[in-house]
């Protein structure tokens, strides 16, 4: 049953301000030690205002991740629909993934580190949202097998896991690095290695 105290309209500026503040606080302090009061202070609202929008800290984390991911998926689907080549679709998806998190280090920290410390939140996110991402990858791989761009015997599930895993590790390495380099620049070489392996190009 919906909480009658939580506003139906979550598109307000104050709602987004609380989400942005939460991402910053979670990234700086860590999810488990962060308090609602920390988020309220960062958002410049009263503690009670946060509770008008969210029941607890877990719901704030889920809402922040889901809102960001939904926006990413809308852009990804829109851009990939313009590309007929499976290879180009994978390249573009890798670029968009790295670009999105590379542009927001706080969100990258929350997604790579804090979300994964909450088993429940990670399971819910994977079940509800990550499957959409993998569907885009597996569709590109399937189309590539059909068109002859990719090996027909290649297992799609394993290939999709390798694709996501490689990008995911690039983001984690960037988050942990003290160097602030353009993360999206890794997209092309990463996809080249995935598609072509380490063998020299044939002449």
Regions found by a protein language model. Give the residues of each.
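Short hydrophobic/aromatic patch on the recognition helix
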Residues: 22, 43-54
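Amphipathic C-terminal alpha-helical segment
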Residues: 99-103, 134, 139, 143, ...
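Alpha-helical DNA-contacting segments of helix-turn-helix folds
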Residues: 61-68
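Hydrophobic alpha-helical connector segments
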Residues: 63, 77-106, 156, 160-163, ...
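Basic, helix-initiating cap at the start of DNA-binding domains
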Residues: 1-29, 34-42, 59
């Amino acid at each position: 049953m919906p909480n009658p105290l939580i506003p139906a309209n979550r598109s307000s500026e104050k709602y987004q301000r609380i989400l942005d503040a939460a991402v910053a606080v979670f990234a700086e302090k860590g999810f488990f030690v962060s308090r609602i009061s920390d988020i309220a202070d960062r958002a410049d609202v009263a503690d009670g205002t946060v509770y008008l929008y969210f029941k607890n800290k877990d719901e704030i984390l889920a809402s922040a991740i889901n809102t960001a991911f939904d926006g990413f998926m809308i852009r990804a689907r829109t851009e990939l629909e313009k590309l007929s080549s499976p290879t180009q679709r994978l390249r573009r998806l890798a670029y968009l993934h790295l670009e999105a998190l590379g542009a927001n280090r706080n969100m990258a920290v929350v997604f790579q580190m804090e979300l994964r410390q909450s088993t429940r939140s990670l399971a819910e996110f994977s079940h509800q949202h990550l499957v959409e991402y993998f569907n885009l990858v597996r569709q590109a791989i399937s189309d590539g097998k059909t068109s002859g761009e990719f090996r027909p015997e290649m297992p799609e599930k394993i290939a999709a896991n390798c694709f996501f895993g490689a990008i995911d590790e690039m983001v984690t390495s960037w988050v942990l690095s003290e160097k602030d380099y353009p993360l999206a620049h890794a997209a092309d070489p990463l996809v080249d290695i995935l598609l072509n392996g380490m063998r020299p190009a044939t002449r």
